[in-house]
């Protein structure tokens, strides 16, 4: 195989810096001078500015256009991103090479594997995004946003506004503010429900800087805490600390998950921990490597990952504590620094 077509837009951005909404890249394995980037006419000026060293192919149907270009150059075996191709798109692509002698080879996870290890520039952007998240949360707490009577949605929008005010390019995902019994829903969407004294308030959010995402969850109690809330919080905090300590280059992903999961299982709450320990973060909020009990593979040095165990008690409430960290040869670098001590606001 002497050519590879990349069509996943996040992978295109990673390889070229191009941020348009329609694009694909042809990588000439034997000669970089043969590389091409395809996009449509809307992005003629943008592609010239963002990818000045790669010759553009201006066609709306990007992948077929690049395959046709490779055929013209004499390539007979072309790789493509099978996990980025739709069934309909693949039918069009295969029809375009019928009886041509060209063989298409579906590949998965090639660029995602590269993205799993961050370089210094990527880590700097992640640090900046995490710092904005930390500062924004501190600001809304100082301003008294998290108080009885504020709705989940109002608190979420206030936090998002603060991230933008502090320089974020965007929010990493729709902010989760989950109060009371809603905090037992891992991915609750904020409603007009008002926060109340005695509520657990779970906040999961992130900022985007230069395309790179932060991810952090903190859980608080409003005004007065019950013993069961403190007990669940302390359990999740212990599991999270165990998970962070297991972040070492070469560690089996499922063993990292087990380090935290065993703490919760041993306390009798295994059935209330309903997701994996974490995931990679970068140009996407969820990317390789995934850390879960069924995960295969090992943790690479330079990976940016979350550690986010949780215990969720339906009808009562839940606690999740999440940090973003970078795996290093020594202790992992903690990028999200908001205090994790049990806090009553």
What are these regions (language model features)?
Residues 1-345:
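Active-site neighborhoods and metal-handling regions in enzymes and metal-associated proteins
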């Amino acid at each position: 195989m002497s050519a590879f077509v990349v069509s996943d837009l996040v992978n295109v951005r990673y390889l070229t810096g191009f941020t348009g909404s329609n694009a694909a890249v042809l990588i000439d394995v034997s000669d970089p001078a043969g590389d091409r980037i395809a996009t449509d006419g809307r992005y003629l000026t943008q592609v010239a500015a963002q990818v000045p060293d790669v010759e553009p192919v201006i066609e709306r149907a990007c992948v077929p256009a690049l395959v046709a270009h490779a055929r013209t150059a004499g390539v007979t075996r072309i790789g493509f991103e099978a996990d980025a191709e739709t069934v309909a798109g693949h039918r069009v692509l295969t029809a375009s090479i019928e009886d041509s002698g060209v063989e298409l080879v579906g590949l998965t996870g090639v660029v995602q594997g590269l993205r799993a290890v961050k370089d210094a520039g990527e880590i700097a952007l992640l640090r900046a995004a995490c710092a904005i998240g930390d500062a924004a949360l501190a600001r809304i707490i100082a301003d008294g946003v998290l108080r009885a009577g504020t709705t989940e949605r109002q608190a979420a929008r206030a936090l998002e506004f603060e991230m933008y005010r502090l320089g974020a390019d965007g929010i990493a995902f729709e902010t989760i503010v989950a109060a009371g019994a809603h905090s037992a829903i891992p991915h609750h969407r904020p409603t007009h429900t008002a926060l109340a004294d005695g509520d657990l308030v779970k906040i999961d959010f992130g900022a985007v800087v230069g395309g790179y995402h932060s991810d952090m969850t903190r859980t608080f109690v409003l005004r007065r805490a019950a013993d069961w809330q403190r007990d669940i919080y302390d359990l999740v905090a212990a599991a999270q600390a165990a998970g962070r300590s297991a972040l070492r280059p070469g560690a089996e992903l499922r063993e990292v998950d087990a380090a935290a999961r065993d703490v919760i299982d041993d306390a009798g709450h295994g059935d209330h921990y309903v997701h994996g320990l974490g995931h990679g973060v970068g140009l996407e909020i969820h990317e390789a490597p995934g850390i879960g009990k069924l995960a295969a593979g090992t943790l690479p040095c330079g990976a940016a990952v979350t550690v986010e165990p949780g215990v969720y008690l339906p009808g009562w409430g839940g606690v999740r504590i999440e940090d973003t960290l970078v795996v290093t040869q020594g202790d992992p670098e903690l990028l999200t620094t908001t205090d994790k001590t049990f806090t009553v606001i």
